[in-house]
Amino acid sequence: MSAISSLRMHYRLFGVPGILKRATAGIKGGYPELLAKLPNRQGAVYVRIHTTDVLVFEHVFVGGGYDFPLEFRPKVIVDIGANIGLASVLFATRYPDARIISIEPEPSNFAVLAMNAKLFPQIEPVHAAVSNQSDVAYIDPEIPYGHCGVQISRKPENGVSVRCLTVSDLIDGFNLPRIDIMKIDAEGAECEILENASAWMDNVKLICAELHERFRPGCHEAFARATVGFLRGWRYDELCCADRTVAEV
């Protein structure tokens, strides 16, 4: 994206404050945070100017990235791969009575997630990765995806350590007898997350996952296998959703 296009996007999304922050970032470097007003006028969120946070903000709040049809009022939402928490914030404004567990492994992303969680108290930030084993994982610096995401490795020599949880760990640790919405955006780790889904999928009402087949072949197959028996499913680009209920019982 050219500098002019970037400035136009910052102005369109964030107004004059966005332009000023973007100009400051261009002169001084770094990624200054901006408290950006939400398009729905239901609060504000922190985003890092001159990063992919801006594109994610547009995707979530302007582009309708998570505007999937829902026939019930969710009480518990689990956001795996929450990044800085923009999808969690969208859910918080849309379902203010819901409890939202937001998990993010990358330290700088998690720091902004924690800031946003303070603005929306129903969001509970968790600094961890999610996979098929309870263990320690490592953020691999050799496979960067900007600020959008990271690649998790089991090799100690590859980067910063982070605790690794399974979905069953989350269910037990946070006392979640039911998960109404599970959102997964894990840069290819969907395969591992969904590997033992039979142990917990009965607890999930609706699951939506960004399937990064280009990073990890087999993600679509893993999702299809894990959601056998769901009553309906749909897809928007990389986002695949499956819902086991058509109407609230």
Segments predicted by a language model, with ranges:
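Phosphate/nucleotide-binding beta-alpha loop and adjacent structural elements of enzyme active sites
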Residues: 1-249
